[in-house]
Amino acid sequence: MSALWSAWGADAFTEQVEKATSEMLPVGSEDIALNLEICDQVRAKQVPAKQAMQVLKRRLSHKNPNVVLLALGLTDICIKNGGDHFLQQVASREFMDNLLSVLRNPAGVNNDVKNKALGLIQNWSQIAQAKPAHMSYITDIYQQLKSDDQFDFPPLDPNAAAVAAALVETLTAPEWVDGDVCMRCRTAFTTFNRKHHCRNCGNVFCQQCSSHNMALSWFGIGQDVRVCDGCYARKGPPKNALKLSRSKSASSSSPSTSSSKHVPSGRGASSSSSHHRSATLGAKSKRSARQKEEDDIALAIKLSLEASAETAPQRSRPTSFATPSQPSAATLSAHKPPNGRVLEGTDADNDPDLAAAIAASLRDWAPPQPSAPFGLNDTAGPAPTSATDASQSANSHLPLPPSLDLAPQDVDNILTFSQTVQAQQAHNQRTGMVGAPLPASVQAMYEKASSARPRMARNLEEGHRRHNVLVSMHDKLTEAVHLYDRLLDAQMTRPAQAYAPHGYAQATYPAASHQGYGYGYQPSIPLHESAYAAQQAGPSSLYLQTPQSHAGPLSDYSGTPAPWLPQQQQQLQPQPQTQPPQYEQPPYQPTQQPYAPHAAQPQYARDQPPPQHSAQQQQQQQQQQQQQQQQQQQQKQQQKQQQKQQQQQHLNPQYQQYASPNPVSNHANAVYADPNQALSPTSTVANTAQYAAYDYSGATIDHASHTQANSVAHTTAPAYAQTNGAASMSSAEPLASQPPDTLSVRTQGIMGGAPSNVSTVVPADKSQVINDGKGNESISTSHLPEDASISSRNGWSAVPTPALTEGALERTATGTDVQHQRQQQSYHQQQAPVKADTSYLPLFPVAPHPDNGFGPDRNAAEATSPMASPYTNAPSSAGMWQNPAGTGVTSASANANANANANADAAATESPLIEF
């Protein structure tokens, strides 16, 4: 009854052991079939060897002598048929000390139990002599009991030792070999392409290469388990199975032996048994595949972190491929309690011991860390005093990677098999025996050569990994070298102008094409200063002024010539600026002046060119300036000659009386000559009388003032606004504020299209006529009377001051006015020119235009549009008093007198074109 209660809740293996050693069995009767089945489970590693040893140890401590006798017999059968891994557990201190305590029981021991136990210990000691690495502790117990007089051993059989050694030679399932790729098709393992181990050879394969199942009776495995394609075709154990089991048992016995000498009883062989694959006949797992996969990954990560934390200071590579896992992982897994197992043939989904073994194997075969960081981390001690000591210390800290060469024996086996197969194939071809079976020796050579395949695969993978590491390091080094070369090139090619001389900030100069001359270094003038340069001279700035009159902020700087200053002024003032021929001056030649730096004006000092370039640049600039001036003068003379030829060819004899009186002209549009000769159609000789320039020193410019760069206030012309045909000024100052003796001339379209209101002082006798009129309001807009409308398109427009009256409407002739306009034209052509007093007014030449009636296209132009007639509002460059909207420009008084006489309307149809 106690046996039933003790077996409650036990696993299947414990139940089978209790059934084989039951109290109900008669004395001397054993269930051999059940004992062999239990032995096969131990041999096939379906049950851990340590767990089987503990179950038998409990049965040996039973009070019933019959149970103890049956347990001793079952233990002897398992030792002879269980394999070397079970021998290690039986020879441990935990099992042998318990058996010794049974023999030395103070209460006494049964004689049958005592005699059978002493006989088994004597036989096991003889087996231990053949396997000293596995069963050395049994030999010690035998010698201890033999020296004691209380125990009498039976006589020793001389042949028993050889027989026992032969009986314990048992084939067992090989240890599993781990890898990242399939050892048959070389396919990498992933989350979905899982790895599978062959139970016959222990290698790792993919699903396609290990899809067969069969029973392995030579290993004591009666169930169908997974095998690879090669083992399934062989239908037998591998040829090196016994050798592998011996070598692995020998290599794994060393930690157990060492631990048996220093570890207390019961913990001797725990390090080696934790790595063995085990399974039971229990129920299948109920968890899903996804849950099992997540648990496996979590367990592997946990074990890897723990192992890396413990073995970080002394991490090193194994010296041989047959070295087992690290003892640290084995110790961790040894303390785990036994749990339920799964059937043989699954991939250890619920086996934590196997998962720990796999994690340890992965850690063993992990790629080594880079040598440089590893060596730097380890050099925490004092630095060596000499270079030799430093190299020795570095070599001692850096572990050498294992060699990738195969063992000489493996190389010999592979070459022997290859040469034998080639010779056999050549012999078959010569004799014509194609397809003849190979001899047995060739099959043995194939098995020997195949044993080196896993090691060769691992070496190949390690070689590829090292090659990839070296390639990546080479790429990084190449990239670093390229970056370093770029930095050196950038430093060598950096321009010298990037550094500011004398500690001042480097000024930014515009391109040479902006200045008109191809000099590489020319200080630029701000636009607001250049624009103000033409207005600084006062009302006489309508003509080209000499540069000496300009007193700008750049007058202090004269270190380098600036031939581009007039060109900038001409670009800002696109209207023609000409003088009479007798007053035409040569181009401005700036003189070289010594440059004296001003301490109070550092903003001009930074515009100074570098000292090493100033002297050469000045000489080059002077030479280039002289050459360019000569070229410009030649081009101007050629253009003038071409223009004169064109004018003489296309001049219609009908309009000879309106031609320019002076045939020699230095201007593209017209010439400045005597206005008296301009009114005479027969005069062809220009008067050489000297006329004063249009300059009134007392003239004022009514502009809105603003601050210039040199803190000098100047004015800006106010804008005109035309609304409903009336001219009005947007200036804040009323017209009534102007002095009574001023003449206001509207110059819209001049100075680059900017409107301007220039007030000039008029002599008293001339201004009296104006003051007697409508007052200051009439001065805002000036109109010409009918008698002053006779003008020439290529001559001069005489505008007498007394004729300035309150202007009539200026409008475009449309509709019925076209006929009246043509009549006026024919009338004016027949009239003799009227000479007026124009000694005090400026003279405005009319520029020729291809559409204003001159040239061979006059008839076509008048036929196309009457507005293109020379006596109508033809296009001009200045466009003064033009009305594009078609409405006349009138003053306030002209708007009041809307019904003017017909003569005023007729005169308004022709607007005199005045161009500066």
UniProtKB/Swiss-Prot annotation:
Keyword Metal-binding: yes
Binding site for Zn(2+) 2: 198, 201, 228, 231
Pfam families membership: FYVE, UIM, VHS
Alphabetized UniProt keyword annotations: Endosome, Membrane, Metal-binding, Repeat, Zinc, Zinc-finger
UniProt GO BP: endocytic recycling; intracellular protein transport; receptor internalization; vacuolar transport
Compositional bias of kind Basic residues: 274-289
GO cellular component terms attached to this protein's record: early endosome; endosome membrane
Main location: membrane
Segments for region (Disordered): 238-293, 307-350, 365-407, 543-624, 641-669, 723-798, 850-892
CDD domains from the UniProt entry: FYVE_spVPS27p_like, GAT_Vps27, VHS_Vps27
Compartment(s) of residence: Endosome membrane
Protein topology in the membrane: Peripheral membrane protein
Renumbered zinc finger spans (FYVE-type): 176-236
Low complexity composition-biased segments: 247-273, 561-576, 590-605
Domain UIM per the UniProt entry, residue ranges: 292-311, 349-368
Description of how the protein assembles with itself and partners: Component of the ESCRT-0 complex composed of HSE1 and VPS27.
Name of this chain's protein: Vacuolar protein sorting-associated protein 27
Naturally occurring in which organism (per UniProt): Mycosarcoma maydis (Corn smut fungus)
